[in-house]
Amino acid sequence: MRRLILLIIVVTGIFVNYSLAQVDSHFSLFEYSQNVYNPGAAGSNDAMCVTSLHRQQWVGWDEGRPQTTIFSFDMPVVDVLGVGLNIYQDIIGFQQDLDISANVAYRIELDPGILGIGVGVGVINRAIDGNWRTWQSLNGGTVYQDPAIPHMESKIAFDMNFGATLVGEDFWIGISTTHLLRPTINFEVGLPSYIARHYYLSGGYNYALPNPSFDLVGSGMVLSDGSTVEFQINAKLLYNKSFWGGVSYRYDDAIVPMIGVHLINGLSFGYSYDIVTSKVGSYNSGSHELMVRYCFNLQGGKTPGRYRSVRRL
């Protein structure tokens, strides 16, 4: 029964989105995926940083559950420019998306902080394998292929993102748009689909507590595809600029405990676990997310774990 419910949800979501839109996958540790959805963040760490994020959503459902992986690289190249490269893979049901994009940001020093205005260009490869697993196929029979659904097709479309990020000593704020040109995917079978523009507003603030060993870090993000709105807020307690733990709330979806550490050699690790509060929560055991980041200070060796900017938390 759970597999049947999952199949209905996944297939309905995919093929309604065929002719309409697709919401970008969300990350609970969204602070570490900014380069993917906001090209203005390229180079904002003032270091060469390599970041990987992996999300396993709705663990406990055997087939069709979303799985998302991000690889991101960014660095400042001169005082006024930052560059980045992103590889993003999203798998859900029959559909697999692979996005590759390059970012460049122009950085302007202002009184409050450094403003980065960036553009990202790349390609989206969308593949569909519309094979239906029926009880006959699981018992040695033929896999059913619906003639109205693309089968073993893959198409590529050009994509563009735009964004701006302002980073200060104790705060950061960003605004961006992804899929600016609304790329269209035309398979040989079925209706043409387009990927809707997505709009992001995100920010964070580091509040120094009376005890100098502790900081309270708050952040939030609002995401909309023009028809739906999703928002998330995070609160973390940072100890000695190195160890942190906290909780996040994503409206009508999940409560998310999270932990992490910034090591002295430039390595950072983070983990979060989504306790799903929506109706699908009864059919899974939550979602897991893992982050690994390595930053290298181009001017003086490895970036220390004790960062001075909230952007690097």
Question: Across the structure, where does each feature detected by a protein language model lie?
Answer:
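Positively charged n-region of N-terminal signal peptides that target proteins for export
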Residues: 1-4, 110
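Sec-dependent N-terminal signal peptides
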Residues: 4-15
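Sec/Tat signal peptide C-region and signal peptidase I cleavage site
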Residues: 15-23
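Subset of outer-membrane beta-barrel
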Residues: 22-313
